[in-house]
Design a protein with these regions (language model features):
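N-proximal low-complexity "stem/linker" segments adjacent to membrane-targeting elements
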Residues: 1-27
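Conserved nucleotide-sugar donor-binding catalytic segment
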Residues: 7-8, 137-225
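Acidic helix N-cap motif at the loop->helix transition within catalytic regions
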Residues: 16-19, 44-52, 94, 98
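Conserved short acidic donor-positioning loop in nucleotide-sugar-dependent glycosyltransferases
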Residues: 25, 40-41, 45, 68-69
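A conserved acidic beta->alpha catalytic loop
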Residues: 31, 39-48, 90
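Glycine-rich, basic loop-to-helix element that forms the pyrophosphate-binding segment
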Residues: 65-81
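Short aromatic/hydrophobic "clamp" motif used to bind/position activated sugar donors
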Residues: 86
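Conserved donor NDP-sugar-binding/catalytic core segment of glycosyltransferases
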Residues: 98-131
Protein backbone atom coordinates (compact mmCIF):
# COMPACT_ATOMS: atom_id res chain seq x y z
CA UNK A 1 0.00 0.00 0.00
CA UNK A 2 1.47 3.35 -1.05
CA UNK A 3 1.85 6.26 1.35
CA UNK A 4 1.27 9.60 -0.35
CA UNK A 5 2.61 12.89 1.01
CA UNK A 6 0.97 16.17 0.06
CA UNK A 7 2.83 19.47 0.26
CA UNK A 8 0.76 22.65 0.59
CA UNK A 9 2.23 26.04 -0.31
CA UNK A 10 0.42 29.39 -0.20
CA UNK A 11 1.85 32.29 -2.17
CA UNK A 12 1.12 35.84 -3.27
CA UNK A 13 3.40 37.90 -5.52
CA UNK A 14 6.49 35.90 -4.58
CA UNK A 15 7.83 35.04 -8.01
CA UNK A 16 11.43 35.57 -6.91
CA UNK A 17 11.23 33.06 -4.02
CA UNK A 18 8.78 30.43 -5.25
CA UNK A 19 10.92 28.54 -7.83
CA UNK A 20 13.35 27.27 -5.17
CA UNK A 21 10.41 25.93 -3.17
CA UNK A 22 8.81 24.21 -6.17
CA UNK A 23 12.05 22.69 -7.42
CA UNK A 24 12.91 21.32 -3.97
CA UNK A 25 9.67 19.33 -3.92
CA UNK A 26 10.12 18.19 -7.52
CA UNK A 27 13.65 17.00 -6.72
CA UNK A 28 12.46 14.66 -3.96
CA UNK A 29 13.14 11.08 -5.01
CA UNK A 30 10.05 9.85 -3.15
CA UNK A 31 7.54 9.13 -5.94
CA UNK A 32 4.22 9.27 -4.08
CA UNK A 33 3.94 13.03 -3.68
CA UNK A 34 1.80 15.95 -4.72
CA UNK A 35 2.38 19.69 -4.43
CA UNK A 36 -0.74 21.80 -3.93
CA UNK A 37 -0.04 25.50 -4.52
CA UNK A 38 -2.58 28.15 -3.54
CA UNK A 39 -1.97 31.51 -5.18
CA UNK A 40 -3.86 34.48 -3.77
CA UNK A 41 -4.27 36.28 -7.09
CA UNK A 42 -0.69 37.32 -7.86
CA UNK A 43 0.00 40.08 -10.38
CA UNK A 44 3.78 39.65 -10.70
CA UNK A 45 3.87 36.81 -13.22
CA UNK A 46 3.48 34.03 -10.65
CA UNK A 47 0.36 32.65 -12.36
CA UNK A 48 2.11 32.15 -15.69
CA UNK A 49 5.03 30.58 -13.89
CA UNK A 50 2.68 28.13 -12.15
CA UNK A 51 1.16 27.16 -15.50
CA UNK A 52 4.62 26.34 -16.80
CA UNK A 53 5.61 24.35 -13.72
CA UNK A 54 2.34 22.38 -13.73
CA UNK A 55 2.95 21.44 -17.37
CA UNK A 56 6.45 20.28 -16.46
CA UNK A 57 5.64 18.43 -13.22
CA UNK A 58 2.42 16.33 -13.09
CA UNK A 59 2.52 16.18 -9.28
CA UNK A 60 1.67 19.92 -9.09
CA UNK A 61 -1.91 21.11 -8.67
CA UNK A 62 -2.68 24.79 -8.21
CA UNK A 63 -5.39 27.42 -8.07
CA UNK A 64 -5.26 31.21 -8.18
CA UNK A 65 -7.99 33.26 -6.51
CA UNK A 66 -8.23 35.96 -3.82
CA UNK A 67 -8.19 34.86 -0.20
CA UNK A 68 -8.44 36.44 3.22
CA UNK A 69 -4.93 35.79 4.46
CA UNK A 70 -2.45 32.97 4.87
CA UNK A 71 -4.56 30.77 7.16
CA UNK A 72 -7.48 30.73 4.74
CA UNK A 73 -5.16 30.01 1.81
CA UNK A 74 -3.56 27.10 3.66
CA UNK A 75 -6.97 25.71 4.58
CA UNK A 76 -7.90 25.73 0.89
CA UNK A 77 -4.77 23.71 0.24
CA UNK A 78 -5.52 21.25 3.04
CA UNK A 79 -9.00 20.72 1.61
CA UNK A 80 -7.53 19.91 -1.81
CA UNK A 81 -4.69 17.72 -0.55
CA UNK A 82 -5.23 13.99 -1.00
CA UNK A 83 -2.17 12.58 0.76
CA UNK A 84 -1.93 10.32 3.79
CA UNK A 85 0.23 13.04 5.36
CA UNK A 86 0.52 16.76 4.69
CA UNK A 87 3.41 19.18 5.02
CA UNK A 88 3.11 22.96 4.81
CA UNK A 89 6.05 24.55 3.02
CA UNK A 90 6.38 28.33 2.83
CA UNK A 91 6.92 29.83 -0.60
CA UNK A 92 10.33 31.10 0.51
CA UNK A 93 11.38 27.80 2.14
CA UNK A 94 12.60 24.55 0.61
CA UNK A 95 13.22 20.87 1.35
CA UNK A 96 16.56 19.14 1.46
CA UNK A 97 17.17 15.92 -0.53
CA UNK A 98 15.68 12.78 1.00
CA UNK A 99 13.14 14.58 3.18
CA UNK A 100 9.98 12.85 2.00
CA UNK A 101 11.61 9.41 2.04
CA UNK A 102 12.67 9.93 5.65
CA UNK A 103 9.20 11.10 6.68
CA UNK A 104 7.50 8.16 4.97
CA UNK A 105 9.91 5.72 6.62
CA UNK A 106 9.15 7.16 10.05
CA UNK A 107 5.42 6.73 9.53
CA UNK A 108 5.92 3.19 8.27
CA UNK A 109 7.69 2.40 11.55
CA UNK A 110 5.26 4.40 13.75
CA UNK A 111 1.84 4.52 12.06
CA UNK A 112 0.19 5.74 15.27
CA UNK A 113 1.97 9.11 15.16
CA UNK A 114 -0.05 12.21 14.40
CA UNK A 115 2.95 14.32 13.48
CA UNK A 116 6.49 13.72 12.24
CA UNK A 117 9.04 16.51 12.56
CA UNK A 118 12.73 16.95 11.86
CA UNK A 119 15.42 19.59 11.93
CA UNK A 120 15.37 22.83 9.98
CA UNK A 121 18.16 25.21 9.00
CA UNK A 122 17.28 28.89 9.31
CA UNK A 123 19.19 30.98 6.77
CA UNK A 124 19.58 34.60 5.72
CA UNK A 125 18.42 35.73 2.28
CA UNK A 126 21.91 35.20 0.89
CA UNK A 127 21.76 31.54 1.97
CA UNK A 128 24.22 31.79 4.85
CA UNK A 129 23.27 29.78 7.92
CA UNK A 130 21.87 31.64 10.91
CA UNK A 131 20.87 28.76 13.17
CA UNK A 132 20.08 25.04 12.96
CA UNK A 133 16.81 24.15 14.66
CA UNK A 134 16.11 20.74 16.15
CA UNK A 135 12.71 19.16 16.52
CA UNK A 136 12.31 17.97 20.09
CA UNK A 137 8.70 18.63 21.13
CA UNK A 138 6.76 15.41 21.58
CA UNK A 139 4.08 16.36 24.11
CA UNK A 140 1.65 19.15 24.86
CA UNK A 141 3.67 20.00 27.97
CA UNK A 142 6.65 20.78 25.75
CA UNK A 143 4.54 23.30 23.88
CA UNK A 144 3.54 25.03 27.12
CA UNK A 145 7.19 25.87 27.65
CA UNK A 146 8.14 26.28 24.01
CA UNK A 147 10.38 29.27 24.76
CA UNK A 148 12.16 27.69 27.71
CA UNK A 149 15.14 26.78 25.56
CA UNK A 150 16.15 30.41 25.18
CA UNK A 151 19.65 30.59 23.81
CA UNK A 152 19.28 27.09 22.39
CA UNK A 153 17.86 26.44 18.91
CA UNK A 154 15.26 23.85 19.87
CA UNK A 155 11.63 23.82 18.71
CA UNK A 156 9.08 22.22 16.38
CA UNK A 157 9.98 23.82 13.03
CA UNK A 158 6.96 24.36 10.78
CA UNK A 159 8.64 23.68 7.39
CA UNK A 160 9.94 20.30 8.56
CA UNK A 161 6.75 19.11 10.30
CA UNK A 162 4.20 16.81 8.67
CA UNK A 163 0.69 15.95 9.87
CA UNK A 164 -1.21 12.72 9.28
CA UNK A 165 -4.53 12.75 7.45
CA UNK A 166 -6.09 11.11 10.51
CA UNK A 167 -4.92 13.96 12.76
CA UNK A 168 -6.18 16.63 10.37
CA UNK A 169 -9.53 14.89 10.25
CA UNK A 170 -9.71 15.09 14.04
CA UNK A 171 -8.74 18.73 14.64
CA UNK A 172 -9.37 20.40 11.28
CA UNK A 173 -7.31 23.13 9.68
CA UNK A 174 -5.84 26.41 10.86
CA UNK A 175 -7.72 29.07 12.82
CA UNK A 176 -8.34 31.78 10.23
CA UNK A 177 -8.27 34.53 12.86
CA UNK A 178 -4.52 33.83 13.20
CA UNK A 179 -2.40 35.63 10.62
CA UNK A 180 1.17 34.89 11.69
CA UNK A 181 1.36 32.12 14.33
CA UNK A 182 -1.35 29.81 13.07
CA UNK A 183 0.95 26.81 13.24
CA UNK A 184 1.51 27.14 17.00
CA UNK A 185 -2.21 27.05 17.81
CA UNK A 186 -2.52 24.08 15.47
CA UNK A 187 0.28 22.23 17.32
CA UNK A 188 -1.56 22.73 20.61
CA UNK A 189 -4.77 21.22 19.24
CA UNK A 190 -2.98 18.34 17.55
CA UNK A 191 -0.91 17.34 20.59
CA UNK A 192 -4.06 17.11 22.70
CA UNK A 193 -4.87 13.94 20.75
CA UNK A 194 -1.77 12.69 18.93
CA UNK A 195 1.89 11.93 19.53
CA UNK A 196 4.81 13.55 17.72
CA UNK A 197 7.70 11.58 16.26
CA UNK A 198 10.95 13.49 15.79
CA UNK A 199 13.76 12.47 13.45
CA UNK A 200 17.40 13.39 13.86
CA UNK A 201 17.78 14.78 10.36
CA UNK A 202 17.58 18.26 8.87
CA UNK A 203 14.61 18.17 6.50
CA UNK A 204 14.03 21.75 5.39
CA UNK A 205 15.50 25.23 5.08
CA UNK A 206 13.61 28.22 6.44
CA UNK A 207 14.48 31.61 4.99
CA UNK A 208 14.37 34.51 7.44
CA UNK A 209 15.41 37.87 6.10
CA UNK A 210 14.12 41.10 4.66
CA UNK A 211 11.11 40.43 2.46
CA UNK A 212 10.01 37.28 4.27
CA UNK A 213 6.84 37.05 6.34
CA UNK A 214 8.70 35.98 9.47
CA UNK A 215 11.10 38.92 9.28
CA UNK A 216 8.32 41.51 9.01
CA UNK A 217 5.96 40.01 11.58
CA UNK A 218 8.05 38.72 14.49
CA UNK A 219 6.30 40.73 17.19
CA UNK A 220 2.87 39.92 15.82
CA UNK A 221 3.81 36.25 15.71
CA UNK A 222 4.77 36.35 19.37
CA UNK A 223 1.57 38.21 20.27
CA UNK A 224 -0.54 35.55 18.57
CA UNK A 225 1.45 32.81 20.29
CA UNK A 226 0.67 34.39 23.65
CA UNK A 227 -2.99 34.67 22.70
CA UNK A 228 -3.09 30.99 21.73
CA UNK A 229 -1.56 30.01 25.07
CA UNK A 230 -4.15 32.05 26.93
CA UNK A 231 -7.02 30.56 24.92
CA UNK A 232 -5.92 26.97 25.52
CA UNK A 233 -4.41 27.11 29.02
CA UNK A 234 -6.59 29.65 30.75
CA UNK A 235 -6.27 33.20 31.94
CA UNK A 236 -2.98 34.71 33.12
CA UNK A 237 -1.75 33.59 36.52
CA UNK A 238 -2.79 29.99 36.01
CA UNK A 239 0.20 27.69 36.41
CA UNK A 240 0.47 26.51 32.77
CA UNK A 241 0.16 30.06 31.47
CA UNK A 242 2.79 31.37 33.87
CA UNK A 243 5.19 28.61 32.81
CA UNK A 244 4.62 29.59 29.21
CA UNK A 245 4.98 33.33 29.84
CA UNK A 246 8.20 33.08 31.85
CA UNK A 247 9.82 30.94 29.17
CA UNK A 248 8.53 33.36 26.52
CA UNK A 249 10.06 36.38 28.27
CA UNK A 250 13.42 34.65 28.46
CA UNK A 251 13.32 33.88 24.77
CA UNK A 252 12.25 37.42 23.87
CA UNK A 253 15.12 38.95 25.84
CA UNK A 254 17.55 36.57 24.15
CA UNK A 255 16.24 37.61 20.75
CA UNK A 256 16.80 41.28 21.62
CA UNK A 257 20.43 40.50 22.48
CA UNK A 258 20.91 38.66 19.17
CA UNK A 259 19.36 41.52 17.20
CA UNK A 260 21.63 44.07 18.89
CA UNK A 261 24.70 41.96 18.13
CA UNK A 262 23.60 41.67 14.50
CA UNK A 263 23.29 45.45 14.22
CA UNK A 264 26.76 45.94 15.71
CA UNK A 265 28.27 43.67 13.06
CA UNK A 266 26.94 45.79 10.20
Amino acid sequence: MTFTISIVTATLNRRDFLPRCIESVAAQSYPEKEHVIIDGGSTDGTVQMLREYAAKYPHIRWISEPDDGLSQALNKGLALAMGDAVGVLGDDDYYLPGTLERVAAEWAAHPEAGLVSGGCDQVHNDGTLWVSLKACFTTRDDLIQCWRYWGQPVMLPAPSTFISRRALGKVGGFEERDRYAMDYRHWIKLTEHFSVRTVDQTLAVFRCGEGTISFSANRRQWAETLAASRDHWGRPLTRPWLRFFVSYLRFYQWQRVLNRLARLRR
